[in-house]
Regions:
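Non-catalytic interaction-recognition regions
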Residues: 1-96, 113-598
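Short, charged, solvent-exposed linker or helix-capping segments at domain edges/interfaces
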Residues: 97-102
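Flexible, low-complexity linker/hinge segments
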Residues: 104-113
Length: 598
């Protein structure tokens, strides 16, 4: 099914072409003056230079030609106005038919254009042995939403958590364990048997061990050197240390999966930094052999600065002077691994925007050295900071970094308090409060452009009014309530609604609110294209907020269930039904559930 913007654009383009003008001037956009028209074409003004005619003359010619064409029959009004705009208003019959067809189509008539892309999305990025905190929130929920939207748009998507499991943090944990429990078999160099399958620690203990080790290493130089030595032994294949490392991984990953599941976030791959290590030696040797890597102050580097750089871009360090690898080394080796395993068209990194320079160096190195094929798109999607009301990074009341599960619990409690007077049992109330709380948290984040910092305001995010997740969910509940009453009235089941509406048509709109709702619904496919192309979940949020507002006006202006004209009543109900399905799909693209009750 053609996008509505394409249907309109093609009609206008053909009018330009038939008059001898280039079709590029037939571009159409949604009107920024909805009081005057629904769509507009500004191409006549752009065509002035090429055709040496007044813009209004060109606009009038095109408007007249469009008026007489077969394609122009979709318009109620075509008007050329000064200085050269072409204002377009669709016929109500066309709009109703278009939305009606959407309702009967898979994916609401959305069809992807061009060849599907294969996209690897790197998001999440937690370190093992540490709890998820609010710093991990944005990467997880932005990445999850992009993954879902890209899949809906017809692309093949591989989501990778990319765990931090290699480096000094492992050495610190192993050293602290050795100090506390030197009798553990993992530290007995003469041991040659099978190591225990059960980890000698719980996740709770691990979470206490790492900060203790990290703090001690900053004050005790000997302890830090011991941790560095333990890291080197691990990375060179010490049996006992590798067994401990595997325990750390299994305990951490089990806990991480549980926490991500609570966020409604999932990954196709649980790859780790360590998985890229085998690719490093050959990668480094090739960089040297090809003349890209050279020694500078003892370190191995690749120069990536360009003459047109507006700011200094330092060389990318591949190996430190002691031969140790860095994050840049691992990230480059991970690109090697991903190209080898998946041959993607795109690799998207959803990470803190403060890492922009790091990824600029990595991307330039990957392209310069041929690690990344020329046609591979490497994209950095840097997200801003979630701040408290004081404008500083969000903290607990005690001033520490808040754990993600605590944040979710606090939001759930806040929503549950707002729902105190609801007539539902306590278990249902808690389940719904959790769904609504997560919607408040996710929508509050995703409705902002990813790159911008935003203020975390629990009262506002959890409100059932305004541009919030709970308001969108409430709109769905309201529509379902209307449909439930109709189901009871007709004596049919929910499962039979699709079949019932299949042969019912939307009739020409009578009210302004009805028309406005249809216009928003009709834009669905255009919105999906935009959100997928720009990796922009906030576009989905803006769309469903507009749809929810339009439905609210529609609900108040039209007597949906008491309409006396049967054809019109079924039309109003079917429009409500299509609206509900589209909002629920959009919520799903954001990783948000739609509760049955609120």
């Amino acid at each position: 099914m053609k996008k509505i913007s394409v249907v309109i654009k093609e009609a206008v383009e053909n009018a330009f072409i038939s008059l001898g003008y280039d079709k590029k001037y037939g571009m159409v956009s949604i009107s920024n003056r909805p009081d005057l028209c629904q769509y507009q074409c500004n191409g006549a003004m752009a065509a002035v230079k090429e055709y040496k005619k007044a813009p209004l003359v060109i606009a009038c010619e095109v408007a007249d030609k469009l008026q007489l064409s077969e394609e122009g029959k979709i318009f109620e009004k075509i008007e050329a106005v000064k200085p050269g705009f072409i204002n377009l208003t669709l016929k109500d019959e066309f709009l109703a038919d278009y939305v009606n067809e959407m309702g009967g189509n898979d994916n609401f008539g959305y069809e992807a254009e061009g060849n599907p892309r294969k996209i690897v999305i790197d998001y999440g990025g937690p370190n093992v042995a540490k709890p998820l905190h609010i710093g991990h929130l944005r990467s997880a929920i932005i990445g999850e939403s992009i993954k879902r939207t890209e899949r809906f748009a017809g692309n093949e998507v591989i989501g990778d958590v990319h765990l931090g499991d290699w480096g000094l943090q492992m050495g610190l944990i192993i050293t602290e364990l050795k100090h506390r429990n030197p009798e553990l078999v993992y530290f007995d160099e003469s041991f040659t048997g099978e190591y225990p399958s059960e980890a000698p620690f719980t996740m709770g203990e691990l979470e206490e061990i790492y900060p203790a080790a990290s703090a001690r290493s900053k004050e005790d130089e000997e302890y830090k050197n011991e941790a560095l030595h333990a890291t080197a032994l691990l990375q060179s294949g010490n049996r006992g240390y590798l067994a401990l490392w595997n325990h750390i991984l299994s305990v951490s990953v089990a806990d991480l999966k549980k926490n991500y599941e609570n966020l409604n976030v999932s990954f196709d791959l649980w790859k780790k930094e360590s998985d890229a290590q085998p690719f490093i030696p050959d990668m480094v040797e090739k960089m040297k052999a090809d003349g890209f890597a050279h020694t500078s102050e003892g370190a191995l580097v690749v120069d990536v600065a360009r003459e047109d750089d507006k700011k200094e871009v330092p060389p990318c360090i591949i190996l430190k002077s002691d031969g140790a690898s860095l994050y840049s080394t691992t990230d480059l080796a991970t690109i090697v691994e991903r190209v080898k395993l998946f041959n993607p068209t795109d690799i998207l990194y959803v990470v803190d925007k403060r890492q922009e320079m790091h990824f600029e160096q990595v991307f330039r190195t990957a392209k310069k050295t041929g690690i990344a094929p020329e046609e591979l798109n490497l994209t950095f999607l840097g997200f801003g900071t979630m701040n408290g009301k004081d404008g500083k990074p969000f903290k607990t009341r005690e001033g520490g970094v808040m754990r993600l599960e605590r944040l979710i619990a606090e939001i759930t409690e806040e929503v549950e308090a707002k729902m105190a007077d609801r007539e539902m049992d306590e278990e249902t109330k808690h389940t719904v409060a959790r769904q609504v709380g997560l919607a408040a948290l996710k929508y509050g984040d995703l409705s902002n452009q990813a790159g911008k910092d935003y203020i975390f305001d629990l009262d506002r995010f959890a409100s059932f009014e305004g541009n919030t997740g709970p308001y969108i969910q409430y709109t769905v509940v309201r529509i379902r309530s209307i449909l439930d009453k109709f189901i009871a009235e007709k004596g049919i089941t929910k499962a039979e609604l699709d079949k019932f509406f299949a042969d019912k048509k939307l009739v020409k709109s009578v009210t302004e609110s009805e028309r406005n709702l249809e216009l928003v619904i009709a834009k669905f496919s255009d919105m999906i294209d935009l959100a997928a192309t720009e990796f922009a979940p906030h576009k989905v949020c803006a769309y469903i907020y507009e749809a929810a507002n339009c439905f609210s006006a529609f609900y108040h202006e039209n007597h949906i269930l008491t309409e006396q004209d049967e054809a019109r009543k079924y039309s109003l109900l079917k429009l409500s039904y299509i609206t509900e399905k589209i909002i629920v799909k959009c919520l799903d693209l954001l990783g948000i559930d739609a509760p049955e009750r609120m």
